[in-house]
């Protein structure tokens, strides 16, 4: 809790945010008795404070604060929290959490004007109904960057937390501000926007300049200004709220990568258009109308031709016209200012006001009815003139279009008459359409202005939707608003209560699921499900003659009495009529459906729309420019009136927008703000208890607090936790060794002094209870403060010691000066001193003259030398400048590449983190989808029961509609038509004839009088529509019946396919995610282990080739063993088939015996023999299966172990190969790449096969050469190590000498400068002279020629041959020039060295400095030598690739041999130079000539290396420029090779898994072989890989689907035949069970295969991406090879480590495959266990048959018991085998499950109680059977054992004694096992049922929508066609008669 000083930053807002220290102290010292202080229930106040006086018999007597004594029940008493919890900021921290505690905490805070309170994870705000100073800039600044626990509750705190989460978690955020109407949502939305607009641009004002001339404000100003404009046109006064938002908006504020404001956009939902023309008494229209009439801007009054009195305009004066809390004049200025700031042009601004004024004038248009006619005509034109002027129209055209609209009939337009009522309705519709389209257009313009085109990274969305509304008159708008709030509340409940708890279970935290009872699915589905309210409304809109009453009747028929949330309202006095009531989460709302059909269809006068499109007001013309623009402006509902296919209702558009909104919200991290209405009277400070409690219950506030307290709301990934909180106790995590993040987090938390029950460890995250994370943050801040303080102290101490040392030195200097001054003062008057002063200058001058003479001579000499050296220096300086420039350019290039590499690595790390986050999101989304499916599952059962009923009712409804239409239009009794279609057609023919006669009569009347023309045409049109509708309905219903059936069958098949695919995809996704997490963890562990094993690499080199051969041998052996296993499996499958045949035959025999009723002893004997044979075969088969599986598992394990061991050894050898055999590995890689590439190209170019063979031959030759080079490299490496050691020693000695030289140089500064100049000149002479420049120019010239030749070789292969030959000749010429130049340079350098030797004799003290230069140059020489080696290898590889691709193998051989020879010569020279350098280095301090020889050798090598380096860099550059295509082919080739290896590994795993399962499912074996063949082809033909896999999978799915369809059909047939014959049912159930078992195993097999393939593909993609990254790094390393050899080594080490990691990952993949195989083995064992149980059941049957045979008196009863037991066992097997398909067969299997449970209960009771509580029908029979069975078993147990000879059954069923363990114990064990299996299968069935229900609901919803769309399209199309035909006939007849 902050102190008053800390709260001072909030300024005047501090008292409204947090209690003062004085109040907190008083609360802590307040007397309190926890036992007697309570809340008690009160009928008036809900709860009151009281003091307990006594407790007796469950009753409590208490005295309230008011002094009243009450007696209540114990459960109506709630303990009170201690006073320190009064006005607590987070109600989750309260000791006692219940409704009265929450209510009074809110009430007390509200009384103190603390309107914001935390409630667990969200914030509760109470509307104060007054202005509070808590939103000023001072408060914004105070909340910026504060953690939630550091500042009082506030909307700014929620906003800042969302902002910080967005920056840290890199995830989009959303703030959902919900509550009932009038709760303060709009105000809080504006505050959120104000906060973001303030903090996101602080300090960046200069950057937010307008991007165009139209913008009048900065981006933050525009975002803030959007609210006043939208409120003016979209907000209005309602009964509960003076500034109610009559539209919903979702404001997205986009931020850049740095968190700065980038742009914004607004999405609006469902503007309440009806308010434009109608308001209730206590309400008023939109604010803009009253702002304009406030006369604040008189020019608007004049421009719009209006008055300042709202009562002059009917549309805006139906309710109130003023609002006390709103100043319309000030609001008008704010609106006008917002229009300017938002960049609207002056024309657009004027158009907005004009269209608004025109809407007001529309309400004053008057029309009257013509005399003796129903035709309407204008009653005056003054108002119409004003409206037309404002809209840029002609008033006469406008009135004519309103009164006489033109309707298109066929291809012609017909003028139609309108009644007065129709005209008024059309005017109102036009006014609403203009206002609505203008509003949407303004929103689009605002979005256009707010889109700054700046880069966006993330956004924060703020949702402000109209709150829940309960008015006296609730229409369609209220239903849409309340439905939206219902969906948002469901989203809140799901996020807070379901996802939160599922996250705990997913992470493995012990948690019991808590059902808070907050599921709102019933009400939501009642509104939006098929045949829901919206669906019925849209269906009614499709029928021309549908009315509000028909809509109400359909609602009642569908839902009244069937849905608890749909009720018939009770009539109330003084209230508007209500037609139905809905029970929402916030209360029951009565809805009036008057006019809903028209509102939903939203018709417009097309003639007036045509005028609008031609308006001179551009904005109006733009609004109605056509359907395309309508959709663009967000209003597609007006655009499609010409074709039925484009017809879209308001409700459909609303649902579409709502679904988009919910999708957006689910993709963000939500933050909830719950707004509360304190009272209905808008009184500040007053709180109505019951009203607040109702909102708290509905909003889930208490449940949210409860789950926050019980659960773990805070969580963080292990890696993030370790990184952030390691500072708390760094010693807990050991340094220098790898430790898993989870273990590190556990150790860290264990070492911290916190309550260990307050956190839990999940699989990927650590979870904290509420408040603990804040405590850790405080501890971290304290620790950081301590560390910083300690660091500052040490820094200050260091600075103080330095200052003290300076002071000591100054003091000593002062003492020295003082001593000398005192001494001088003592001797200055001494006579000898005076003489000394006089003589000393004379002596010094004589010496000076001598010295000057000598110095002049020396100066002359030096001057001459200087002149010579100066000339040389200038020449060398010029060269130095050029070289320095080149060096700087290279350094800049290297630096840029290094920065790019760093950026790439950073991006890679970010992508990895993002990938982890996205995977977590995918899991959450998947779980969320599963939750949604579970929510919908309950209703699916009801829907399934009603499906048949609905289809029948729908047919009846269609027939009734046809009948009603005929009764209304034809006035004939058509009851016979419903019974028979033939009679209906006859009636229609008669009706058509009569209508034709009436039409002729009407046409004759039309010729007689023009006055009756319009009325008669209306009748003709009406009758024609009726006739065509009837004809169309009859024809279409007859024709579409068969199409509908076919369509439903097709959709049913598609549904089944989609359900199977969905389930497989979900399962595979979960498996892949789990496997990925395990593999990632193991990958980290393996990387750490590999780092420790690298030291053993050098000892394992000789074993590489032998191990590879061994691997191949083992693989060949494994393939042989796998073939043997396949043969064994085939035999096993045959045996299994024989077993199933015998089993089926045995069952048939048993059934025949049962049907016969009295089997003979011979038949029983035969049955026993067959069963014994069957049992023996089964036992043999099981033993063989176990043996084969054990053998296969052992072989696989042995193979995996050997492969792992060999792979580990290979990995160990890899580093040595790459480090010590650079040339060998690169050339081998190049040749392998060429060979692989030629294999690929050989399919298209057969002529390259010869080159492949040539390359293979050359490979063997190169390997021998490489072996020799390997030995040479080893020797050179050893020499280099010794030289490096000696160089280090020399460097140390040189450092010491440098220090000595620096001291001597102070005394001889002039001479040292000359020496330094000479040394620099000497170094420059050694580096380069005129010969070097000549050689460089010739080399560049040669390189230019080579570049031109290389470009020409792209034009043709012949030109490439000539270019390569010429380049080789020029290279040879250059080499000869180089050799001659080198000889000349050597002679010149020898002369220079002699001169240097003489100088060195005179200046021997400077030898050490020169020696330092020698050592550094030696290092440079070695570095450049390595670079030369690498670059030479690169050139050789590139030349080899070019030669291979262009069929120039011979030239390649020549070039390769030349480079090889040169390479060997260079190595020989290097070896000689190194030996000579080593010998010279040892004698450096004794022999002076050693320096000359070393320098000579050094310069020779430098010259050669530099020339070679220049040549190679130029060649590399031109080859890189000209060979882009070659490199691309190489990359493709390497990718293919990598994919080949990866896919090969995956293929082996997949084959192992498939072969393991092939023995069980023979029908799937062919499909898996097809998968294998497809994968093999994919390796050879990469381009067809994906298509082949898809086709293969599709074939598998189709085959499996067809199999499943066949089994389902057979299953359904079996169920239908069950009613006819029980014997046939048993046989078909056995077949069905067998088929289902095979299909289920096939599905499991396919899922496992698909999961392995997907996992393999993921690893393949990861490896490819990693390889691409490494290739890019390698390319950069090659470019930086000249100056950054150390970086090359580092990157190569990185490459090696990555390669090892990839191989480790492959090994882990193999391990995972092995685990999968082990799991399959376990599965097999479980299947064997199941078979054993089935065997036991069969044995029980045989035993009971034996008992029946021996018990003659009870033979018939025992036989019946055996029949019952067999039926029970068969149904148990049926339930077990068909559980995977229950989602499609639940309805048919419900009875079967019940029978199974019933019989299982009977068996359990029989075993436990001896038949005491049997069902009435079987009681007597089973009792007798039980007694006989027990008596017979006691006498014959030994005989039964001998006959059956089943030792395994004897051991399992514990038949070891004769009397103690009899039939009861055996049956008990069997029943327990069966019951456990039944329960497990029930759980599986429920899960499958839920999935099935979800899929069925989705399918049926789609099916229903499709049916509706097709029906609407067919109806509209047939109506249009027939109307066209009829109109043509009428037109032709009229013309002919005229």
Curated annotation (Swiss-Prot):
Keyword Plastid: no
Domain named IQ: residues: 784-813
Segments forming a coiled coil: 842-1938
Domain annotation Myosin motor: ranges: 86-781
Region annotation (Disordered) ranges: 1124-1146, 1152-1171
Residues annotated with Phosphotyrosine modification: 389, 424, 1463, 1491
Sorted UniProt keywords: Actin-binding, ATP-binding, Calmodulin-binding, Coiled coil, Cytoplasm, Hearing, Methylation, Motor protein, Muscle protein, Myosin, Nucleotide-binding, Phosphoprotein, Thick filament
Domain Myosin N-terminal SH3-like: 33-82
Residues modified as Phosphothreonine: 64, 69, 419, 1240, 1264, 1285, 1466, 1500, 1516, 1729, 1735
GO CC aspect terms: cytoplasm; myofibril; myosin filament; myosin II complex
Region (Actin-binding): 658-680, 760-774
GO molecular function: actin filament binding; ATP binding; calmodulin binding; microfilament motor activity
Binding site for ATP: 179-186
GO annotation (BP), single: muscle contraction
Basic and acidic residues: bias regions: 1127-1146
Residues bearing the modification Pros-methylhistidine: 756
Primary localization: cytoplasm
Record PTM Phosphoserine, positions in chain: 625, 1091, 1095, 1161, 1236, 1242, 1260, 1287, 1291, 1302, 1305, 1473, 1494, 1513, 1541, 1553, 1573, 1599, 1602, 1713, 1725
Comment on protein domains: The rodlike tail sequence is highly repetitive, showing cycles of a 28-residue repeat pattern composed of 4 heptapeptides, characteristic for alpha-helical coiled coils. Limited proteolysis of myosin heavy chain produces 1 light meromyosin (LMM) and 1 heavy meromyosin (HMM). HMM can be further cleaved into 2 globular subfragments (S1) and 1 rod-shaped subfragment (S2).
Subunit structure: Muscle myosin is a hexameric protein that consists of 2 heavy chain subunits (MHC), 2 alkali light chain subunits (MLC) and 2 regulatory light chain subunits (MLC-2). Interacts with SLC26A5.
Similarity section: Belongs to the TRAFAC class myosin-kinesin ATPase superfamily. Myosin family.
Function, as annotated: Required for normal hearing. It plays a role in cochlear amplification of auditory stimuli, likely through the positive regulation of prestin (SLC26A5) activity and outer hair cell (OHC) electromotility.
Protein name in UniProt: Myosin-1
Record organism: Bos taurus
Phylogenetic classification of the source organism: Eukaryota, Metazoa, Chordata, Craniata, Vertebrata
């Amino acid at each position: 809790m902050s102190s008053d000083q800390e709260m001072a930053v909030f300024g005047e807002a501090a008292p409204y945010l947090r209690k003062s220290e004085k109040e907190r102290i008083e609360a802590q010292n307040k007397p309190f008795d926890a036992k007697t202080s309570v809340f008690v229930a009160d009928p008036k106040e809900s709860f009151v404070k009281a003091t307990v006086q006594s407790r007796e018999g469950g009753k409590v007597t208490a005295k309230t604060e008011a002094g009243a004594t009450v007696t209540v029940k114990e459960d109506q008493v709630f303990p009170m929290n201690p006073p320190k919890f009064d006005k607590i900021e987070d109600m989750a921290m309260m000791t006692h959490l219940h409704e009265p505690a929450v209510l009074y905490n809110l009430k007390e805070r509200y009384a103190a004007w603390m309107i914001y309170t935390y409630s667990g994870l969200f914030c509760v705000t109470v509307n104060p109904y007054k202005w509070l100073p808590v939103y000023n800039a001072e408060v914004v600044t105070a909340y910026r960057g504060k953690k939630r626990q550091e500042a009082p509750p506030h909307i700014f705190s929620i906003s800042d937390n969302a902002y910080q989460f967005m920056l840290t978690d890199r995830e989009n955020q959303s703030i959902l501000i919900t509550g009932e109407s009038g709760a303060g949502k709009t105000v809080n939305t504006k505050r959120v926007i104000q906060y973001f607009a303030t903090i996101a641009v602080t300090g960046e004002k200069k950057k937010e300049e307008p991007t165009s001339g139209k913008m009048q404000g900065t981006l933050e100003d525009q975002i803030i200004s959007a609210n006043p404009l939208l409120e003016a046109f979209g907000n209005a006064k309602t009964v509960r709220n003076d500034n109610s938002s009559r539209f919903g908006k979702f404001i997205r504020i986009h931020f850049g990568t740095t968190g700065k404001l980038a742009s914004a956009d607004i999405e609006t939902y469902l503007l309440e258009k009806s308010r434009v023309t109608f308001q209730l008494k206590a309400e008023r229209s939109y604010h803009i109308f009253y702002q304009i009439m406030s006369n604040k801007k008189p020019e608007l009054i004049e421009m719009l031709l209006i008055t300042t009195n709202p009562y002059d305009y009917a549309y805006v004066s139906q309710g109130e016209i003023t609002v006390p809390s709103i100043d319309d004049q000030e609001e008008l200025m704010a609106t006008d200012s917002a229009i300017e700031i938002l960049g609207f042009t002056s024309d657009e601004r004027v158009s907005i006001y004009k269209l608004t004024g025109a809407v007001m004038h529309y309400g004053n248009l008057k029309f009257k009815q013509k005399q003796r006619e129903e035709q309407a005509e204008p009653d005056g034109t003054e108002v119409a003139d004003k409206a037309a002027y404002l809209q840029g129209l002609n008033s006469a055209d406008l009135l004519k279009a309103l009164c006489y609209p033109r309707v298109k009939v066929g291809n012609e337009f017909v003028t139609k008459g309108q009644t007065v009522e129709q005209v008024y309705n059309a005017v109102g519709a036009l006014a609403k359409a203009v206002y609505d389209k203008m509003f949407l257009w303004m929103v689009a313009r605002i979005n256009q202005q707010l889109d700054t085109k700046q880069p966006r990274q993330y956004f924060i969305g703020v949702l402000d939707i109209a709150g829940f509304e309960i008015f006296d008159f609730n229409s369609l708008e209220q239903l849409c608003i309340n439905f939206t709030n219902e969906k948002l509340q469901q989203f809140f409940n799901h996020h807070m209560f379901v996802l939160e708890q599922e996250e705990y279970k997913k992470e493995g935290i012990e948690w019991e699921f808590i059902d808070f009872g907050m599921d709102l699915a019933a009400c939501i589905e009642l509104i939006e499900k098929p045949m829901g309210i919206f669906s019925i409304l849209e269906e009614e809109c499709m029928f021309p003659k549908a009315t509000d009453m028909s809509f109400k009747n359909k609602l009642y028929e569908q839902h009244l009495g069937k849905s608890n949330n749909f009720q018939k309202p009770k009539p109330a006095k003084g209230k508007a009529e209500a037609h139905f009531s809905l029970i929402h989460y916030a209360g029951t709302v009565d809805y009036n459906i008057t006019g809903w059909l028209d509102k939903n269809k939203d018709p417009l006068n097309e003639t007036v729309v045509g005028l609008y499109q031609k308006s001179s007001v551009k904005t109006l013309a733009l609004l109605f420019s056509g359907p395309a623009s309508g959709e663009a402006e967000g209003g597609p509902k007006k655009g499609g009136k010409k074709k039925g296919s484009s017809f879209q209702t308001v409700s459909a558009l609303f649902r579409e927008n709502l679904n988009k909104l919910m999708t957006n919200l689910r993709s963000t991290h939500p933050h909830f703000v719950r707004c509360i209405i304190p009272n209905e009277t808008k009184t500040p400070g007053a709180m109505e208890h019951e009203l607040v409690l109702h909102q708290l219950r509905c909003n889930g506030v208490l449940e949210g607090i409860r789950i926050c307290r019980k659960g773990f709301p805070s969580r963080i990934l292990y890696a993030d936790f370790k990184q952030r909180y390691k500072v708390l106790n760094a010693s807990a995590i050991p340094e220098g060794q790898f430790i898993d993040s989870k273990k590190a987090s556990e150790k860290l938390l264990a070492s911290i002094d916190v309550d260990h029950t307050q956190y839990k460890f999940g699989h990927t995250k650590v979870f904290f209870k509420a408040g603990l994370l804040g405590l850790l943050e405080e501890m971290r801040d304290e620790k950081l403060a301590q560390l910083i303080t300690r660091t500052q102290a040490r820094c200050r101490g260091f600075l103080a010691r330095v200052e003290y040392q300076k002071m000591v030195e100054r003091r000593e200097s002062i003492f020295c000066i003082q001593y000398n001054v005192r001494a001088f003062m003592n001797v200055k008057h001494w006579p000898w001193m005076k003489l000394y002063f006089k003589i000393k200058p004379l002596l010094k001058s004589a010496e000076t003259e001598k010295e000057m003479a000598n110095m002049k001579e020396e100066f002359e000499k030096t001057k001459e030398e200087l002149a010579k050296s100066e000339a040389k220096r200038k020449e060398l300086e010029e060269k130095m400048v050029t070289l320095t420039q080149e060096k700087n350019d290279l350094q800049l290039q290297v630096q840029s590449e290094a920065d790019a590499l760093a950026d790439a690595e950073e991006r890679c790390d970010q992508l990895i983190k993002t990938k982890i986050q996205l995977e977590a999101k995918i899991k959450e989304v998947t779980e969320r989808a599963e939750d949604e499916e579970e929510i919908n599952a309950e209703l699916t059962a009801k829907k399934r029961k009603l499906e048949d009923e609905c289809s029948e009712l729908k047919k009846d409804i269609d027939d009734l509609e046809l009948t009603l239409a005929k009764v209304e239009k034809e006035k004939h009794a058509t009851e016979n038509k419903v019974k028979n279609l033939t009679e209906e057609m006859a009636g229609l023919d008669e009706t058509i004839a009569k209508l034709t006669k009436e039409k002729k009569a009407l046409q004759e009347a039309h010729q007689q009088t023009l006055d009756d023309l319009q009325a008669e045409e209306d009748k003709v049109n009406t009758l024609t529509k009726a006739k065509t509708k009837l004809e169309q309905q009859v024809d279409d219903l007859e024709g579409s019946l068969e199409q509908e059936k076919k369509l439903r069958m097709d959709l049913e098949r598609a549904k089944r396919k989609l359900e199977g695919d969905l389930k497989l995809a979900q399962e595979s996704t979960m498996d892949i995610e789990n496997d990925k997490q395990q593999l990632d963890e193991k990958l980290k562990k393996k990387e750490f282990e590999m780092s420790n094993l690298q030291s053993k690499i050098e000892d394992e080199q000789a074993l590489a080739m032998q191990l590879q051969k061994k691997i191949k041998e083992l693989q060949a052996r494994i393939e042989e063993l796998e073939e043997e296993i396949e043969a064994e499996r085939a035999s096993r499958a045959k045996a299994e088939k024989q077993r199933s045949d015998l089993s089926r035959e045995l069952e048939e025999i048993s059934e025949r015996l049962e049907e016969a009723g009295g089997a003979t002893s011979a038949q029983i004997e035969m049955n026993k023999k067959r069963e014994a044979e069957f049992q023996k075969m089964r036992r043999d088969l099981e033993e063989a299966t176990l043996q084969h599986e054990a053998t296969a598992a052992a072989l696989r394990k042995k193979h995996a172990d050997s492969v792992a061991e060999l792979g580990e050894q290979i990995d160990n050898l890899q580093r040595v190969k790459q480090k010590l055999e650079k040339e060998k590995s690169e050339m081998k890689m190049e040749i392998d790449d060429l060979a692989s590439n030629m294999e690929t190209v050989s399919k298209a170019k057969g002529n390259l096969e010869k080159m492949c063979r040539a390359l293979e031959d050359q490979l063997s030759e190169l390997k021998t050469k490489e072996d020799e080079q390997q030995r040479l490299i080893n020797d050179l490496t050893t020499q280099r190590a010794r030289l490096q050691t000696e160089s280090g020693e020399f460097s140390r000695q040189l450092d010491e000498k440098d220090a000595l030289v620096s001291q001597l140089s102070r005394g001889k500064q002039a001479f040292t400068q000359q020496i330094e100049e000479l040394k620099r000149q000497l170094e420059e002479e050694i580096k380069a002279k005129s010969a070097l420049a000549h050689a460089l120019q010739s080399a560049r010239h040669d390189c230019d020629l080579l570049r031109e030749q290389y470009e020409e070789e792209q034009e043709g292969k012949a030109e490439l041959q000539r270019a390569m030959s010429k380049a080789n000749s020029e290279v040879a010429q250059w080499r000869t020039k180089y050799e001659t130049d080198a000889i000349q340079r050597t002679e010149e350098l020898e002369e220079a060295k002699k001169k240097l030797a003489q100088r060195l004799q005179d200046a021997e003290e400077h030898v050490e400095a020169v020696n330092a230069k020698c050592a550094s140059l030696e290092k440079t020489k070695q570095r450049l030598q390595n670079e030369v080696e690498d670059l030479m290898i690169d050139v050789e590889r590139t030349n080899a690739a070019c030669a291979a691709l262009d069929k120039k193998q011979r030239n390649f051989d020549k070039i390769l041999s030349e480079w090889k020879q040169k390479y060997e010569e260079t190595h020989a020279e290097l070896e000689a130079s190194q030996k000579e350098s080593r010998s010279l280095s040892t004698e450096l301090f004794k022999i002076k000539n050693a320096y000359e020889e070393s320098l000579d050798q050094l310069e020779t090598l430098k010259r050669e290396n530099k020339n070679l380096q220049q040549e190679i860099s130029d060649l590399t550059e031109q080859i890189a420029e000209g060979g882009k295509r070659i490199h691309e082919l190489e990359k493709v080739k390497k990718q293919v090779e990598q994919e080949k290896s990866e896919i090969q590994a995956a293929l082996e795993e997949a084959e192992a898994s498939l072969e393991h399962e092939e023995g069980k499912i023979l029908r799937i074996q062919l499909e898996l072989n097809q998968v294998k063949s497809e994968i093999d082809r994919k390796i050879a033909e990469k381009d067809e890989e994906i298509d082949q896999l898809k086709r293969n999978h599709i074939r598998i799915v189709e085959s499996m689907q067809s199999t499943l369809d066949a089994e389902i059909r057979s299953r359904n047939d079996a169920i239908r035949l069950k009613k006819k014959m029980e014997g046939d049912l048993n046989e078909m159930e056995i077949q069905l069970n067998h088929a289902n078992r095979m299909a289920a195993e096939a599905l499991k097999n396919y899922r496992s295969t698909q999961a392995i393939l997907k996992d393999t593909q993921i690893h393949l993609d990861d490896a490819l991406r990693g390889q691409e990254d490494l290739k890019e790094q390698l390319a950069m390393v090659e470019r930086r090879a000249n100056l950054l050899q150390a970086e090359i080594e580092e990157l190569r080490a990185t490459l090696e480590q990555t390669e090892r990691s990839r191989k480790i990952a492959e090994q882990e993949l193999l391990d995972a495959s092995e685990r999968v195989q082990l799991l399959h083995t376990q599965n097999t064992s479980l299947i064997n266990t199941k078979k054993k149980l089935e065997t036991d059941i069969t044995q029980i049957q045989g035993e009971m048959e034996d008992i029946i045979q021996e018990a003659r008196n009870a033979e018939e009863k025992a036989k019946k018991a055996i029949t019952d037991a067999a039926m029970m066992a068969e149904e148990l097997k049926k339930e077990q085998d068909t559980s995977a398909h229950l989602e499609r067969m639940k309805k048919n299997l419900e009875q079967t499950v019940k029978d199974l449970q019933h019989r299982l209960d009977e068996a359990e009771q029989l075993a436990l109680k001896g038949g005491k509580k049997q069902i009435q029908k079987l009681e007597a029979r089973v009792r007798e059977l039980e007694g006989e069975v027990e008596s017979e078993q006691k006498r014959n147990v030994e005989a039964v054992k001998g006959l059956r000879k089943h030792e395994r059954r004897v051991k399992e069923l514990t038949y070891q004694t004769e009397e103690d363990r009899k039939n009861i114990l055996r049956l008990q064990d069997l029943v327990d096992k069966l019951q456990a299996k039944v329960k497990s299968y029930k759980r599986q069935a429920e899960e499958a049922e839920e999935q099935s229900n979800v899929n069925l609901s989705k399918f049926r919803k789609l099916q229903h929508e499709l049916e509706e769309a097709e029906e609407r399209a067919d109806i509209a199309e047939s109506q249009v066609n027939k109307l066209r035909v009829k109109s043509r006939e009428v037109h032709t007849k009229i013309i002919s008669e005229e």
